[in-house]
Amino acid sequence: MHKHHLSKKLFFAGLVLFIIGAIGVALTMNKGNMIEKGEPLTKQWDLSAENINSIAFSSERDVTFEWKESTNGKNYIELKGNYSANDKKAIQKLDPVSEDGTSFNITVPEEEDWYNGFGKIYAYGQQKVTVYLTKDTKLADLEVKSHSGDINVADFKVKKFVSSTNSGELKVSNLEANTAQMATSSGDLELSNMKANSSVETGSGQTDLTNLTGDLEVNGGSGDVNVTGVKAKKLKIAIDSGDIELTSGTVTDLAVLTTSSGDIDASTKGKVQAESNSGAIELAGITNDVTAKTSSGDIDVAFIKQVKNIAINTDSGEVELELPGDFKAIYEASSNSGRIKVPTSDSNTDNRVTVKTSSGDIKIEK
């Protein structure tokens, strides 16, 4: 009984100390003593009046990077944000502009102690970089990188665009380029309203791509890939783990969709190759040849016009094909364990439909 009362006393004593400590922390934070927001800085660098060869920016923190038309007839770059006193002094001393003014290369200095458990919380917030160029000034190369921060890039027209972040989100919108390379190691990636031949590398995180024009290649580790409104000659999506969704797309040559573990759902024009080791495949609005393969999962494909070759294979799963009423083909269907329903073959055509499943029903109907 004595031990029980002692335990209760110790518990309440600890609770009181915790409450007192919490109140102290709250009061300290309310006074602004624990949260360090840094000192505001606005810094501008003048560029050449001629075309700009390259702009390169690197930072540890979140950054918004955008283009605006210059209204004063000059080309220049503006950096705004809150920084520590030491970083502010260091930035003001930087000279990132090349001698001829056509190149800009900056790595924003960062103090290492963002959080000290016995000191302050450093909350400097987001940086903003604005590139002011006259209407007739052209920018060749743009590179934006961050080690552990989010990146948001908007409204640029360049020849080459490169952007990457190790652990942070990457967003790019309203960008036009000959080539665009984007990469995230751990973070979501979002691209919208872009005209470029684009390549995307992701480690883990969701990828959302909307209204892209140009050839597209996506290689990823784990995370879903959603593509809407793409217009491309060639498209390739290959991920280790995650679903692939392709909607309202026009791929005139070939769309290759591959996931080791996940479903594939696509609606696009052009040839399609789809493969999943473990997951269902559903294709709709198809207007060209299809090859679909899965080790374990159903395959459902709907065609809206005559095509020459359809090849479907699944080890374990049902197959259902929906064809136009005037579709003509020679049908070859086989299942080791399952029912088979196919139309009558037409011997006066070279079009072929080949469907194989080890275990599952096959249904082909017009």
Task: Cite the ranges covered by each PLM segment.
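N-terminal Lys/Arg-rich, disordered targeting/topogenic segments
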Residues: 1-7
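A mature extracytoplasmic/lumenal domain signature
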Residues: 59-61, 69-71, 81-83, 108-112, ...
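Long, intrinsically disordered low-complexity tandem-repeat regions enriched in serine/threonine/proline
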Residues: 143, 164-166, 171, 176, ...
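Residue-level recognition of well-ordered beta-strand positions that form the cores
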Residues: 56-58, 66, 78-80, 107, ...
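Hydrophobic membrane-insertion alpha-helices, especially the h-region
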Residues: 11-27
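Short linear S-[DN]-x-LW-Φ motif typified by the pepsin-like aspartic protease active-site region
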Residues: 31-109, 116-162, 170-173, 190, ...
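N-terminal targeting/secretion presequences
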Residues: 14, 18, 133, 157-162, ...
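Short, surface-exposed interaction patches in beta-rich subdomains
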Residues: 189-198, 204-366
